[in-house]
């Protein structure tokens, strides 16, 4: 092999190695930013990973909202009408957050089975339901339109 071909070969191999490393870094960064959606049933059954950021969604159980008198801590229970999961949140809840409405909470599941949320998203319209929540309610045998009427 002449020196010019050898030089080209090493250049091409170096470029391929660089592209491979860049793709590896990109995939690693994307994997860390993925927040998978879990229903209360999946969380209660142990399908959700501990100490990993997840999205938990469902309907806020009526009578489950407990607000702390001296801080912004809120504790409530989310259900898909099959199983329920407690969620804690520190901060100001969205204006449209209320019992009997659909929400999606972003946070980490701790060892006690409680989702410690750092963000809570509430539905913004009477007819709107997050797609994940609608799918979970259909799978549990509840129609999305009946969800607000159930206790």
From Swiss-Prot:
Ranges that cross the membrane: 9-29
GO CC aspect terms: plasma membrane
Protein's UniProt keywords contain Metal-binding: yes
Positions annotated to bind heme: 124, 128
Source organism superkingdom: Bacteria
Membrane topology: Single-pass type II membrane protein
Sorted UniProt keywords: Cell inner membrane, Cell membrane, Cytochrome c-type biogenesis, Heme, Iron, Membrane, Metal-binding, Signal-anchor, Transmembrane, Transmembrane helix
Any one Pfam family match given in the protein's UniProt record, by short name: CcmE
Protein name: Cytochrome c-type biogenesis protein CcmE
Gene, per the UniProt record: ccmE
């Amino acid at each position: 092999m002449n020196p010019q071909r050898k030089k080209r070969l090493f250049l091409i191999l170096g470029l391929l190695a660089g592209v491979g490393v860049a793709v590896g870094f990109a995939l690693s960064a994307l994997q860390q930013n993925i927040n998978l959606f879990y229903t209360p049933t999946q969380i209660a059954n142990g399908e959700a990973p501990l100490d990993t950021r997840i999205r938990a969604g469902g309907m806020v159980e009526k009578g489950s909202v407990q607000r702390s008198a001296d801080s912004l801590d809120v504790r409530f229970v989310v259900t898909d009408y099959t199983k329920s999961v407690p969620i804690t949140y520190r901060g100001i809840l969205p204006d449209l957050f209320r019992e009997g409405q659909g929400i999606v909470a972003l946070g980490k599941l701790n060892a006690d089975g409680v989702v410690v949320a750092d963000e809570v998203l509430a539905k913004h319209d009477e007819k709107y339901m997050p797609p994940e929540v609608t799918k979970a309610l259909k799978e549990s045998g509840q129609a999305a339109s009946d969800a607000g009427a159930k206790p």
